[in-house]
Structures are given as structure tokens and as C-alpha cells.
Amino acid sequence: MQRRLLYGSAIALLTAIVLAAARVGEQPGALSDWQALALGITQGLTELLPISSSAHLILVPWLGDWQYLKAHPGFNKTFDVGLHLGTLVAVVAYFWSDIVRLVVAWVGSLRRRGISSVDERVAWYVAIATVPAALVGAFGESVIDERLGEPWQIAIFLTLFGVLLWVADRQPETRDLGGLTFVSGVGIGLSQILSQMPGVSRSGITITTGRFLGLGRDAAARFSFLLLVPITFGAVLFKGAKVAADGLPPGSIGPFIVGMLAAAAVGLVAIEALLGFVRRHNYTPFVVYRLLAAAVIVLLIASGFRESTF
């Protein structure tokens, strides 16, 4: 990681900790800044690793019995915007030069009405792969929120898609990003639809699909991170517009800022860690983690320590 990004990450996390300690913008009975810090760190780690951020953002309050987010959906949506804005900042900062290069290439291909370089092709595939999940997210969000996301469902999805990742990662690495095809882009884009379900993981399912299609581990991870930019940017705008129209819920400013800073800081480290790891290793540790997490969920429910719903 570039030194300036490392320093920026450290400063952002330290600022979040100081704000949480000062309880800035906190309201009695609402989500505390310390809880927001924990969820921001969770988001930064799990959004960018193939282990499902949406699942962990449900499981952490479930384990801690934090009922406030469940009982206040308006606050929850506002806080969710802040967390995703944080990880968006992390990805844009880390891949800034790649993003600028791809945008310039995409604009150039529009002007010439043709595709003549690898960058232009990758830029178009990122755009194509974004469309299916964006449509489902825009029109199916309420259905997903109402019917999916219970801990017992998360345990199933963590297991099922963890096994799929393990199988996919055994496929030969035959392509880099330059070897992407139109069919690959569409296939990875369609797979993103499944990521709306907590426990699947957006990065996990796109990496899984990429590996099934022959992408190398590093290429699959990089393409997954690039896909995060437009889909998360669109989600932040879409949800942010709703929040702006309804107004900020009381007590949301402090947790919003703390969570966003923590997610951005930890997200930068998570990107560097994953890319460095998969250059030398496979995705098996993440598969093992998913299976262990699912087993713990089932054990907690079976023992009566926690309810199967939240």
C-alpha cells in the first residue's frame, strides 16, 4: 500500500476512535458511537473480503442484542449509507489510477464508437456487469429486506456459497483481466444479483463466478473491487436521496461519521491484505471462516442462546 494511503487510513481510524470516545452526536437510547465504530470496522473488513458484509452487519447486532437498528429502520438506512460511503471511498482511493484510466478509456471508446484496447473492454464489462444488480437493488430492496436476512438464513447462505467458492477456486487460472469476454462480463454481472441476499457476499459471488470462468485469483479480486465502485456509488445515491428527502433521524450524525471513517480506514487495509494474500495463496481460509461462522450461528440458535430471527 502506498504510504500516503496507509497514513490516511491510520488518521481516519484514529479520528473515528476519538469521536467515539467523545460521544459526538450521540443520543441516549440510540446506537452509540462505539457501536457505530464496531460496525464500521466490520463493514470495512467484510465488504471487501468474500465473507458477506450484509450478513455481518446483521450478526454483530444479533450477537450483541442491539435492538435499536431493528426497531428503527429509518436510522438503519441512514447509517447504512454512511458505511457504504466509507468503503466506496476506500476502493476509489486505492484504485484511483485504475479508475481514471478506465473512465478515460470508456469515454474514448464512446467518441470513436468502437473498442480497441483492453482498458476500453474492461471498462465496458464493468458497466455491463453493474446493470443486473442495480436493477434488482432498486426495485427489489424492500422484498429482500422483508424476507431475507434472518440468522438461520445467513447460516445457509454462508455455507452454500462458501462451498461454491471452494469449488470455483480449484479451477485453472487461464485468464487475466485482459482475457475477459462479453459473456464473462454478463455472467459476473448476473451473479451479483445473488449478492443482495445476506450471507452470499458481493465480492464472494463475483470472485466465485470469475474463478469458474477461468480468471486468476488476483484478476478475479481486482475485477470484483472495480465492480464495487459503480454499484456502491449508485446505491449511495439512491438511498442517500431517500434519506435526504426524509431528513436525518435524531442521533444519526455522530454514528454516521464514526462508522463511515472506520469503514474507509479498515477497507483500505482489507483491500491490500486480500490482494497480497491471493497472489500467494488460495481462497480456502475464507471458505473455512464461512463454514465456521455458519456452524457458530447454528450452535447459538440450537442452544437457545440466541433466537433464529432478529
Regions found by a protein language model. Give the residues of each.
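Multi-pass membrane proteins that catalyze or facilitate reactions on polyprenyl-/lipid-phosphate substrates
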Residues: 1-310
